[in-house]
Amino acid sequence: MMPALSRQARNALGFFAILATVGLFLPDYRLLVVNQHLFLALNVLALNFCLGLGGQISLAQGGMAGIGAYASVLAHAHFPQASVLVVPAVVLAAFAFAAAISRPMERLGEGFLAMATLGVSLIFTNVVLTMGDVTGGSAGLMVDSRLNLPGLGALSGDRTFFFLFLMVMACGCWTFAALKDSRPGRALLACKDDPLAASSCGIDRAALRSLSFGLGGALSALAGVLHAHYGGFINPEQFSLELSLKALLFLVIGGPGNVLRPLVAVLVLETLMSGMQFLGEARTLAHGLLLTAALLAGYWRSSRPRRRPPGSAVRVAEARKPM
């Protein structure tokens, strides 16, 4: 007999089954909006690797998504048929870059870490504006190349990219859950719960946080790659600080460390806010009230008494077990 699926696995299967059904039957012009929500959801999931596992508040998701987008577009301009090589190279480079900058930023301490990651997004924007001859500057850059996959050819269309976004999200959720249940994941949670106790037990906090930050940066870069080739046009405003702040907001609403709730929060709340166009100028107030209510609901949920999972001491002990 096959082992019974856990509750989390059943919830994940139901969530992605519902999204797949939506993608099959929703009209193309509706999918255009949904795909923008999925792009934001991928960045929320990327931030969850940093904050939900490593306890690192990051405002670099917009910059990392922009790095992935511009790197892929510029590389495809020279190698238009090499998507199979270009996309993995961009993602791996983003992982290496994020993991590398995490090390020195870790030494700044918790209070300055968010400010340091904010600098990544600001530096990205300044570099794009300065190198206008290559990046198009503030005017943006038209994306003439398309993603090409062997046997499928050039990928285009709202529905095709919907399922690409969905597939990347499913892989990201699986990676997050697998890492969380692994020994490095338990060590990361121990560092998050009690950094001093984890360090005193010999856990390399900086190396583990480099891993979580690198994975978050790589996922944001991949989201940027899909966003660039789907929309056909990129400019710095698409990857501004607003994207990083929205990712942080929705992650706080859904709960850092939970893999599905932040994604549901993005899709539900963004859909509701998109449907408030009829309110005219009052929609800004309505958006604020809706997000405030969602934040209060998230706070109420997190403050309810509940059975606590094993504490940091147990996680540290499990993380120290020999491989």
Question: Which residues does each PLM region occupy?
Answer:
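Single transmembrane alpha-helix segments in multi-pass membrane proteins
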Residues: 23-77, 103-113, 190, 195-199, ...
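Residue-level recognition of pore/gate-forming positions within transmembrane alpha-helices
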Residues: 40, 66-70, 91-95, 119-123, ...
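Cytosolic-side transmembrane-helix boundaries in multi-pass membrane proteins
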Residues: 1-18, 142, 191-208, 272-323
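Transmembrane alpha-helical segments in multi-pass inner-membrane proteins
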Residues: 62, 87, 209-296, 307
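Membrane-interfacial amphipathic/re-entrant helices at transmembrane-helix boundaries
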Residues: 1-42, 71, 80-86, 157-159, ...
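Extracellular/periplasmic helix-loop junction at the C-terminal end of a transmembrane helix
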Residues: 120-154, 185, 302-308
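Alpha-helical transmembrane segments within multi-pass membrane transporters and channels
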Residues: 79-122, 264-266
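Helix-loop-helix "hairpin" substructures at the membrane interface of multi-pass membrane proteins
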Residues: 155-235
